[in-house]
Amino acid sequence: MLALGKLLDLTLAGREPTEKIQLTADGTRLHWLAEGALEVTPIGARDNGVDLLLSAGIHGNETAPIELLERLIRKVAAGTLKPAARVLFLFGNPEAIRRGERYVEQDMNRLFNGRHEEGSGNEAFRAAELERLAQVFFSKTERVHLHYDLHTAIRGSKIEQFALYPWAEGRQHSRSELARLRDAGIEAVLLQNKPGITFSAYTYGQLGAEAFTLELGKARPFGENQEVNLERLERSLELLIDGSEEQPDGSRLDGLKLFSVSREVIKHSDHFRLHLDDDVANFTELSPGYLLAEDIGGTRWVVDEVGARIIFPNPRVKNGLRAGILVVPAKL
């Protein structure tokens, strides 16, 4: 197998490869662009016009998606997975991955869409670098641009595998992309309703890609992801990469749950209190009238939505950041 197929090993060791460009036996080109960044280009006769960006490790302790990308990279390098799509593999936060920590100084997935310009440190610099790499990768016109940013969550979930679909002015959510997610094992999709500051929000809103954040289970250390079943997603990504995927049928979205954002719970001060157990699962239902959170100045978040569920509850975020999202069932 080609040395560039060991991108994770290189990243964990903090090493640059001796050869930054290598070719497989059939002519597929592997190009190491930067730390944790590998571009795969198919031979011209096989290129099907798809540009697929796969990122993982924006949070360094979310290892199951990193291991998934590593398996795909090794298959490409060994010649057992023959790409028809251009693919950019990104391990987002190398230093946090090496430390096995969510982040070193700042939550990187709050630093996109220009937020990195307001910060400093390695994670702000890396967010800017990831934006640049994505911008260059998606600069070819008249091609299909698709981005999956793969994550696992801090806590368990009533719906284990779900996606967040960004929002941008004047764009409609794609039924065929939703069908593709369903076919890959994604059980639910949260349709967002305002611009975001995540990596997928950047590639969707600024670069025009179809882009999603995928939440794929609970975060665990390397080698301890046996309970995270990514077989359907891995197979779907292989079909996308080698060009043998059947066109998703977006006319029916049976089996896919859709949600929309009702409200975000923002932590304003150190007096913020979230009235949920630390181990409450994502997508836990909350009854109307439930006092969800309180903050300084008499600020109260009381559930008044029917069918409301909580996702990403985290009272430990910095002041001014989102400490949870209330979502409700939705339709297209």
Swiss-Prot record:
Q: Which residues of the sequence carry a binding annotation for Zn(2+)?
A: 59, 62, 151
Q: Which cofactor does it need?
A: Zn(2+)
GO MF annotations for this entry? hydrolase activity, acting on carbon-nitrogen (but not peptide) bonds, in linear amides; hydrolase activity, acting on ester bonds; succinylglutamate desuccinylase activity; zinc ion binding
Q: Which reaction does it catalyse?
A: N-succinyl-L-glutamate + H2O = L-glutamate + succinate
* Family matches, as InterPro entries: AspA/AstE_fam (IPR050178), AstE_AspA_cat (IPR055438), Aste_AspA_hybrid_dom (IPR007036), SuccinylGlu_desuccinylase (IPR016681)
Q: Which Pfam families did the record assign?
A: AstE_AspA_cat, AstE_AspA_hybrid
Q: Which residues form the active site?
A: 215
Q: Which GO terms describe its biological process?
A: arginine catabolic process; arginine catabolic process to glutamate; arginine catabolic process to succinate
Q: Which UniProt keywords apply?
A: Arginine metabolism, Hydrolase, Metal-binding, Zinc
The entry sums up its family as follows: Belongs to the AspA/AstE family. Succinylglutamate desuccinylase subfamily.
What protein does this entry describe? Answer: Succinylglutamate desuccinylase
Give the organism, scientific name: Pseudomonas aeruginosa (strain ATCC 15692 / DSM 22644 / CIP 104116 / JCM 14847 / LMG 12228 / 1C / PRS 101 / PAO1)
Q: What is the lineage of its organism?
A: Bacteria, Pseudomonadati, Pseudomonadota, Gammaproteobacteria, Pseudomonadales
Please state the gene responsible for encoding this protein: astE
